[in-house]
Amino acid sequence: MDTFRVAGVLAAAALTARLGEAQTPAPQPTPGINPTQEIARETPEGPAIVAGPTEIRIGGYVGVTGVFRSTADGGGIGSNFATIPFSDTADGNLSEFRLSAQASRLSIRVNAAPAPDRATLAGYFEMDFNGTVPGNVGVTSNSAGFRLRNAFGEAQYRGRFIVAAGQAYTLMTPPKGQLSIWPSDYDLTYAVDVNYVAGMVWGRVPQVRFTYRPSTSFNWALSVENPEQQIGSGVVTLPSCCASDLTGQYNTGSNGLDVANFMPDIVSRVAFNQGKLLHIDAGGVLRVFRQTVKPYDQPVKQTGGGLSVNARVTPGTTTVLGQFAYGPGLGRYIGGLVPDVSISADGQIHPIRTTSWVVGVEHRLTTQASAAIYDSGVHADRNYSVDTSGSDIGFGYPGAPTSANKSIHQVTGVFAWQAWSIEGRGSLQWNTQVSWLRRTPWSAGTGPPSADAVMVLSQIRYNLP
């Protein structure tokens, strides 16, 4: 009897061990440093909780970011590139310093193995703490608001056809290689600033996307994205006949979701890859702006949008990159740094032509350290007319407010170092960004011709396994 009991116990132990092995994914090699803010690429990484045919991964990082600026723009860990204060103001003569944990990030990812002749499914949620904050947030509790960044689902059919829906980076955002909706597959620089660098084309918007990948060398994608026509706050002078009507029809920074947009933005992009050595992509966005004024019986529509071309060359451990965009009415997609349109006294819509760029060199020093330098910026053409009263209106006219920027230019250097990494336990890293920034308005009046700032952002973070 004892012999049978011992045999039964051994058999049960063996079965339990087998089941445990089946429930635990094979260990993966410890990855090198990820010098960017983004934490999830299309290929799953890290340990997973296995539940039947699905794998669940909880990711993100916990960190603190120190910020120093030579002028006080009050932007927290996201810089207000378009409103750097001038030297003849109080804020232009005050530096600022703060520590913040708002960049800490939490993600939940689910990957489901495909059933026979069915799609491979994946879902992703990503949040941080850069949401709405109460006016006294920094006094005692520092209770920063939880914020949605990404939330999307994806279905891949035989590795060639992909359908994705949810909130994610716009298809106008520069990719690193193959067209993908996953955040780490975009070329968002090494910047610590949560607004990245001035001149970058990006946005996280609700969308439905279709991608066709006949090979790794060629991809094509089409995206239907949530629109939002915007003119900034106090940047565009509206015609006196209908300023109050028009203010409610364009996002001026305080409209929430009240703007009555006409139709979704349509974005398309193609990408060409030669292994990891060379990547080139090109695409564009079609937008339609709409408004109405008294007697409200003739809505006015105007098309706009823009084109962008991006390239990366990676010979070994160094990457040289260039991102260029141009178009009338493209301002929303360049971090909202330029208004989309101006409006003349006859009620016609005039898209503002905008040019932006990011060029840089990124170098992986070791598997634990990387460095990069970037030159970036945006230029907006002036677009104004004469009101019925005889005064100038629109954007960039002589005597326009100093918030109407002709150009914003930024030079940025970043160093990232992974102090330690332990398989299955995560890693500790330190990223530091130093930037010089200049904004030049179309009309400075009697004040200084431009506003300059130096910024240092340094972050220590623990990356969850």
What positions do the PLM features span?
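Outer-membrane beta-barrel translocator domains and adjoining extracellular loop/strand segments
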Residues: T71-G76, G135-A144, K176-P183, G232-G256, ...
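Surface-exposed loop/turn segments flanking beta-strands in extracellular/periplasmic regions
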Residues: G78-D88, Y186-V192, A243-D245, S342-G347
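Membrane-embedded beta-strand positions of outer-membrane beta-barrel proteins
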Residues: I58-G60, G123-F125, V163-A165, W220-L222, ...
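Membrane-spanning beta-strands of outer-membrane beta-barrel proteins
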Residues: A101, F146, G203, M263-D265, ...
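Outer-membrane beta-barrel "beta-signal"
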Residues: F415, S450-P465
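Detector for outer-membrane/organellar transmembrane beta-barrel domains
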Residues: N261, N273-G413, W417
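Outer membrane beta-barrel
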Residues: T43-G78, D88-V236, F262-G275, R312-Y326, ...
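Cleavable N-terminal export/targeting peptides
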Residues: M1-T36
